[in-house]
């Protein structure tokens, strides 16, 4: 059985000096160019969706997977039901999404968007319950087995925004991902596996990389989400910011391109220290936020400069994130009204960075 080591390994060189741990990548993965794209709602798998994304310049999509709809209601907290949903969902992925993605030259990141067992207790049930922990690992064994050898799979994204509060009873957010990654490697030795930082603030914020540890397996990517400054990107979206009105840039607050670099500095340091590849699974600012087009442009340009893979949040999901919509009235998630648009400042900003600018 393959095991996974989280702590820093000290290799010994021929001279006897300790060498720092470095992430290992197979030559084909090490040679990969940067990919750019968007989060794809699991409801959005039509030919027009992939064609549009390709026209925009996307080369990857982050494909959400979680039980939704009347048929699968409540199955997140039922192992048999979750397993049945996963079998069905993998059929949809292989039979519909992957063929369309291949047709349009787009690769898929397979995203476990909601953890089996749901959230609660220490943050995720599987962190406190060994049955759910084992089940989560078994789910990834199933996914790797069903998708092994399928052309067009860019990576396996183990958990979306893993939440943990306090000390779990079974394993922590990183240990459970380590176990799943090792299980995948027993089946598939090379497809990259994406490990996420802890979702302790701002939906997997860059600051969480201060506590991230590298994993001693080949082809591991490390993920954060970029919703910073959080009170700007989520103003009047979350109850915490129900009265917030903020603009970007804001020199007085240090909210500008250089400020964004300071925010992601922990990730940059991790990348340099361990030679790690970075995946930015989501970034966005709500459509009614003043200056959000400039924020998209600055974040995208920074990610392109650093060569980090990224997916914008989101494509054809909620209009507040969609660049195919504009706000016609209102200034909050509760009051905003939207109209479709095929040309607006936010769209132009995203299309520019999708093309590498």
Regions picked out by a protein language model, each given a short descriptive name:
Residues 1-5:
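Bacterial N-terminal signal peptides that target proteins for export
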Residues 6-9, 15-60, 71-80, 107, ...:
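Non-catalytic accessory regions flanking glycosidase/transglycosidase catalytic cores in CAZymes
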Residues 20-21, 35, 42, 138-141, ...:
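Extracellular glycoside hydrolase catalytic/binding regions
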Residues 39, 60-62, 109, 157, ...:
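Conserved beta-strand positions in the central sheet of alpha/beta enzyme cores
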Residues 46-117, 135, 174-188, 292-305:
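Aromatic-lined substrate-binding rim segments of carbohydrate-active enzymes
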Residues 64-67, 113-117, 159, 197-199, ...:
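Short, solvent-exposed turn/loop segments enriched in Gly/Ser/Thr/Pro and often Arg
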Residues 71-74, 117-124, 165-167, 203-205, ...:
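Extracytoplasmic/secreted cell-surface and envelope-processing proteins
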Residues 120-142:
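Active-site-adjacent "subsite" loops/lids of carbohydrate-active enzymes
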